[in-house]
């Protein structure tokens, strides 16, 4: 107590039974997220601890607007590595296929940063520590990114895949998705 008197010991044999119990029914709510396209990951922050092992990555959709995302401006993740700890933050590391789809879409762009980077998800995305589903974040009320890190690593040519002599077309493979409109064949040496 305040006078530094020790508390009385209560043994297991003399333990007191609880007289009333109110379970936690308050769902966790997302407060924001960081998008790091250079590292290929996002970190979502919640109002209370969530169980990272309950994360369903395929319930996450990235979109270009908080409300009414365009068809080209939204993408639902298919897979990814997730943090499994009990925490107020969940880290999702994108699989290569999803990361390339994100980079080729019209959202979370280098030009607009956080201004076109929103997130929505269903109630089955994650549970809190007591098993309560997260508050639904509808596509009509997306959570805005709070921090954005652009992918500033240039793609590298991985392989010369094939050459079609009849059409004069070549196929090249790169380390990540590229914008074909920026390709300058005059700078290519065979």
Explain the meaning of each model-derived region.
Residues 1-190:
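Non-catalytic beta-sheet/beta-sandwich ligand-binding modules that flank or precede catalytic cores
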